């Protein structure tokens, strides 16, 4: 068994990464792609490796010279690499390919080293490594028959998104027998490039062969998480994350702040959503309108306020719509002056926007609780202009009842202090204590209250970025609207506001389910030795580690969960307010997901 790599291309889409070297010399986490590949070949017991090279070939040859004495490395030059494609590179290697059973691979891959060993040891003579199609994949896809053989290769023009469940993406790693290469593949390839062009892809020939004989090339199935194809800098970033480990892996995930659809196998307990909403009917209605929405401009702020006012039962003059609550937090901070009292630990977006120099930190006790009196006293002592209350608080889950918020608003009003009330998680409180200040009667009576609510978090639609700010101060609403762009939310977000009322009863039911599952989840977590769960009225739980769990630590636990179980949690070790212990925050997801996390925690702490 030998190996052959096609590495003549220029890798133009990688920009500066391939300015001075070929694509296979691009580093991923400190090691080049070619090093990963050769080490995988050596691990599989392969002794001979041939590379078809072209662009920056001398740089590559010098890099590999004497580096791997365990394996024979030969080179074939493709000096017309800039005007040909990989079909010609493979044709140049026809004698090598026909001389022995061969592992064929491309130069822009990073992959689990076990894959090469698996196909080398497989009894199947001719194999294509494939993964069940996922949305992030691009390139050649196949359809398999019942015997897991490739019966058809789907061209881009025939690709149908409605059939993706039946598609398998080629990883661009193959095993060809000597007989297949010599008697079937190379004769077809030679004839094809003579008849058509040298600027084609070798998969085109495989498409013809699979059409004529749907059993000759078997599929070797691997998980999509075990490989990645690197065509551009965005791919490189994703590959670096996928193939990192420990603290580097965790930090890489945190730094993206989302976009986790690129990691479909990962279970996200870090970011906070509503697992029971929206219902399929709402999603399908939005899908039905997707073409029109994609091609249409959204309305301006007055129409958005009208739609949001309808949902929340307030006058449009009392509500502003933002591109997520984050835009509204930024806007209110820009329009504010003076000090703001912030109970901590808290959601960092607020102190980041108001500025540490204007933030008065109100320390909570060891149970992360505080009283109305604590807040009022701090506001008075520091001559604050504002108080921020996230209710339930993030990340503690601490909760003020409706009466407590009313008392707080009244006492602050008497001191000419405004209350910024963030209700992003209040809908998840137990039904008997659930309430909202987004009510025209309440905000008209308590004119010093400014309510902010993240629709993205509460309604399970973070991708469309929606939030609202509510106040009876109409001049403030006008200022907020002037402070944002005329089209600050997109057509998909506007359409969600337009149709939401039809699904309002489903939303209430979804919030009840979260409250119920939170109780069960909290109870099960509390049974794990070394895990203390704090009471919460939100869609997340604050936990403190003790005993043996504390020795692992919050950071160590987050690393173990991500590397070993593909589960992402929020490590709070670097967050202000958690200096005296090991704390994590866990989102409340559905029962199945929560049980998967509980199983992982029990294994780690056993």
Functional labels for PLM-detected ranges:
Residues 112-196:
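Conserved core of the sugar-phosphate nucleotidyltransferase
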Residues 166-170, 279, 300, 448-527, ...:
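PLP-dependent aminotransferase class I/II
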Residues 334-389:
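PLP-dependent aminotransferase-like
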Residues 238-296, 382-383:
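N-terminal "arm"/small-domain region of PLP-dependent enzymes with the aminotransferase-like
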Residues 515, 525-565, 588:
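Conserved PLP-binding catalytic core of the aspartate aminotransferase-like
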Residues 2-5, 31-102:
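Conserved N-terminal catalytic core of the sugar/cofactor nucleotidyltransferase
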Residues 1-19:
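N-terminal nucleotide-binding beta1-loop-alpha1 segment
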């Amino acid at each position: 068994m030998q190996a052959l790599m096609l590495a003549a291309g220029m890798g133009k889409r990688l920009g500066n990464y391939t300015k001075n070297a070929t694509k296979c010399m691009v580093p991923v986490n400190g090691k080049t792609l070619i090093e990963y590949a050769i080490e995988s070949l050596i691990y599989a017991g392969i002794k001979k490796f041939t590379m078809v090279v072209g662009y920056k070939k001398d740089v590559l040859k010098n890099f590999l010279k004497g580096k791997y004495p365990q394996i024979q490395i030969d080179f074939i030059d493709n000096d017309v690499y800039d005007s040909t494609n990989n079909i010609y590179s493979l044709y140049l290697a026809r004698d090598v390919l026909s001389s022995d059973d061969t592992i064929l691979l491309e130069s822009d891959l990073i992959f689990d080293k076990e894959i090469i060993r698996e196909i080398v040891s497989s009894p199947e003579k001719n194999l294509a490594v494939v993964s069940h199609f996922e949305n992030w994949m691009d390139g050649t896809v196949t359809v398999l028959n019942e015997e897991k053989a490739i019966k058809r290769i789907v061209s881009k023009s025939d690709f149908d998104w409605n059939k993706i469940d039946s598609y398998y993406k080629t990883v661009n790693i193959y095993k060809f027998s000597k007989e297949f290469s010599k008697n079937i593949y190379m004769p077809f390839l030679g004839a094809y490039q003579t008849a058509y062009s040298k600027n084609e892809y070798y998969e085109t020939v495989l498409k013809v062969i699979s059409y004529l004989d749907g059993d000759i090339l078997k599929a070797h199935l691997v998980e999509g998480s075990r490989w990645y194809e690197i065509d551009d800098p965005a791919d490189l970033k994703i590959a670096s994350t996928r193939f990192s480990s420990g603290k580097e892996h965790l930090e890489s995930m945190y730094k993206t702040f989302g976009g986790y659809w690129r990691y479909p196998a990962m279970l996200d307990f870090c970011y906070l959503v509503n697992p029971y909403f929206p219902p399929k009917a709402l999603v399908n209605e939005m899908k039905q309108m997707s073409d029109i929405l994609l091609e249409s401009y959204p309305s301006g702020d007055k129409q958005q306020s009208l739609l949001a006012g309808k949902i929340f039962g307030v006058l449009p003059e009392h509500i502003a719509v933002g591109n997520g609550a984050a835009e509204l937090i930024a806007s209110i901070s820009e329009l504010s002056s003076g000090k703001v009292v912030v109970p901590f630990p808290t959601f960092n977006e607020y102190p980041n926007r108001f500025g540490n120099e204007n933030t008065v930190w109100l320390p909570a006790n060891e149970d992360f609780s505080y009283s109305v009196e604590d807040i009022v006293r701090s506001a008075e002592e520091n001559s604050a202009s504002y108080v921020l209350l996230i209710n339930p608080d993030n990340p503690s889950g601490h909760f003020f009842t409706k009466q407590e918020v009313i008392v707080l608003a009244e006492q602050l009003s008497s001191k000419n202090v405004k209350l910024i009330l963030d209700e992003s998680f209040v809908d998840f409180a137990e039904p008997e204590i659930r309430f909202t200040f987004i009510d025209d009667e309440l905000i008209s009576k308590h004119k010093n209250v400014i309510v902010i609510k993240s629709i993205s978090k509460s309604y399970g639609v973070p991708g469309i970025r929606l939030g609202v700010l509510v106040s009876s101060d109409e001049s403030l609403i006008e200022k907020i609207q002037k402070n944002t762009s005329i089209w600050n939310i997109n057509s998909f977000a506007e359409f969600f506001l337009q149709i939401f009322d039809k699904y309002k009863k489903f939303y209430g039911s979804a919030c009840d389910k979260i409250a119920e599952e939170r109780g069960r989840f909290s109870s099960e977590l509390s049974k794990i030795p070394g895990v203390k769960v704090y009471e919460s009225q939100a869609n997340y739980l604050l936990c403190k580690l003790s005993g043996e769990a504390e020795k692992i630590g919050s950071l160590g636990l987050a690393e173990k969960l991500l590397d070993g179980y593909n589960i992402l949690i929020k490590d709070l070790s670097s967050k202000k307010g958690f200096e005296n212990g090991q704390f994590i925050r866990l989102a409340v997801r559905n029962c199945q997901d929560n049980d998967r996390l509980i199983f992982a925690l029990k294994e780690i702490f056993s």
